[in-house]
Amino acid sequence: MKSMIAVLLLALVATSMAGYLGLGYGGLYGAYGGLYGAGVPVGRAVAYSSSIRHPGFGGLGVLGGYGGYGYGLGLGAYGYGGYGLGYGLGLGLGHGKIW
């Protein structure tokens, strides 16, 4: 579980940094959509395979996503990719529930 959280945080930082490095509006909105779309089924698969059934995990993913989003903005960029990944994984892990 700890390694999964570490990988998620690394992904959030990486996608936020991608915004900082100047991938542009279109690419970041695309990353948001793609990561959000991939995050939901991946989160659900992890939740079911590891017997994580508590909706609260959705909140963790959403908060992680906001962290990536805020980090991107703080650097003068747009971390929509990190937001999408955290939100999608959060919804998946929470079985569609945010809290």
UniProtKB/Swiss-Prot annotation:
Major subcellular location class: secreted
Locations listed in the record: Secreted
Cellular component aspect of the GO annotation: extracellular region
Signal peptide stretch: 1-18
Disulfide partners: none
Tissue spec: Expressed by the venom gland.
Keywords: Secreted, Signal
Family the entry assigns: Belongs to the non-disulfide-bridged peptide (NDBP) superfamily.
Name of the protein this chain belongs to: Glycine-rich protein
Organism: Lychas mucronatus (Chinese swimming scorpion)
